[in-house]
Curated annotation (Swiss-Prot):
Entry EC no(s): 7.1.1.-
Biological process (GO), any one: aerobic respiration
Taxonomic source organism: Pseudomonas fluorescens (strain ATCC BAA-477 / NRRL B-23932 / Pf-5)
Quaternary assembly: NDH-1 is composed of 13 different subunits. Subunits NuoA, H, J, K, L, M, N constitute the membrane sector of the complex.
Biological role: NDH-1 shuttles electrons from NADH, via FMN and iron-sulfur (Fe-S) centers, to quinones in the respiratory chain. The immediate electron acceptor for the enzyme in this species is believed to be ubiquinone. Couples the redox reaction to proton translocation (for every two electrons transferred, four hydrogen ions are translocated across the cytoplasmic membrane), and thus conserves the redox energy in a proton gradient. This subunit may bind ubiquinone.
InterPro entries listed in its UniProt record: NADH_UbQ_OxRdtase_su1/FPO, NADH_UbQ_OxRdtase_su1_CS
Enzyme class: translocase
Disulfide topology: none
Keyword Membrane assigned: yes
Stated name of the protein: NADH-quinone oxidoreductase subunit H
Catalytic activity: a quinone + NADH + 5 H(+)(in) = a quinol + NAD(+) + 4 H(+)(out)
Length: 335
């Protein structure tokens, strides 16, 4: 009897897809640090990294070697188990969240009916990594940064979820592929769910702790925040994890609001991966542009903005969407 039954082949293909996608995401996250430095230099009218290799292209290799050979030091006053666990949880939660992203009609790790809920579960898990890092470091700046990060992340995840409820109401599903196919038959959600898009994008920047919402690791205030005591590859996992978060939020924006792998007006459907990659790259550049152009507000202003602006906006968007869906739903006679 052959071991290669259709079920076994499906499992093998799923594992291969998962390995390829996760390796590609990790490599892209590492390369994104170099791309960001070059773009920031270009936009700010200065040189970026330009010494190592042609156009500074090997700078990322030099940085990785430096990080790899640095001493993996753990402070003697830290809780060593939790201190080591925190960067692992931070990076793995973001990588696992990529399982629900449909890159093309055939490429994706898992086609879950609760795809959106799975994403929020993994996003919530990353909050524990930040709390673990700040608490286990036994450092007042790290603890204050972790408390800032957890409060900010939990607050903006509320609005991130509410921003997507309008899409769920219209599609009637939490499945990511169902959402993409709905947009292929109708308008991309950037038009009917524009308020939801704005709130989701703002919340995405805040959840990834990117500028201008990088108060949890503000160098001028907290001396690098919750990962101040980290060095070597542990710090590198936090560092690369931040860029993986940028890629994840950008891919979600493309999937949920910009038609996923579909081109505009159904142009060149055979180039599904190219369309997905181009749209994701656009939002990644938008993240970097925000860092280059916007100052950092105070922490209390960030929290006030979340509850006084984002919450009313998401609730209004959800109410309008529900009213429109009910209006367009044909009445059913009660027997």
């Amino acid at each position: 009897m052959s071991w290669f039954t259709p079920e076994v082949i499906d499992v093998i293909l799923t594992v291969v897809k998962a390995i390829v996608i996760l390796l590609a995401v990790v490599i892209a996250g590492a390369l994104l640090s170099f791309v960001e430095r070059r773009l920031l230099g270009w936009w700010q009218d200065r040189y970026g990294p330009n010494r190592v290799g042609p156009f500074g292209m090997f700078q990322i290799a030099a940085d990785m070697l430096k990080m790899f050979f640095k001493e993996d030091w753990t402070p003697p006053f830290a809780d060593k188990v939790i201190f080591t666990l925190a960067p692992v949880v931070a990076m793995s939660a973001l990588l696992i969240a990529f399982a629900i992203i449909p890159i093309t009609p055939t490429w994706g790790v898992a086609d879950l009916n609760i795809g959106l809920l799975f994403f929020f579960a993994m996003a919530g898990l990353s909050v524990y990594a930040v709390l673990f890092a700040g608490w286990s470091s036994n450092n007042k700046f790290a603890l204050l940064g972790s408390l800032r990060a957890s409060a900010q992340t939990v607050s903006y995840e509320v609005f991130m979820g509410l921003a997507l409820m309008g899409i769920v109401v219209q599609v009637g599903s939490f499945n990511m592929r169902d959402i993409v196919e709905y947009q292929a038959q109708n308008l991309w959600f950037i038009i009917p769910q524009f308020f939801g898009f704005c709130t989701f994008f703002i919340a995405g920047v805040a959840v990834t702790h990117r500028h201008p919402f990088d108060q949890p690791e503000a160098e001028q205030e907290l001396a690098d925040g919750y990962h101040i005591e980290y060095a070597g590859m542990k710090w590198g996992m936090f560092f690369v994890g931040e860029y993986i978060g940028i890629i994840l939020i950008s891919a979600l924006l493309v999937t949920l609001f910009f038609g996923g792998w579909h081109g505009p007006f159904g142009i060149l459907p055979q180039l599904s991966f190219v369309w997905f990659a181009l749209k994701t790259a656009f939002f990644i550049m938008l993240f970097i542009l925000l860092r280059a152009s916007i100052p950092r507000p105070r922490y209390d202003q960030v929290m006030d903005f979340s509850w006084k602006f984002c919450l009313p906006l998401t609730l209004i968007n959800l109410l309008i969407t529900a009213a429109v869906v009910l209006w367009n739903t044909p009445a059913v006679a009660v027997q």
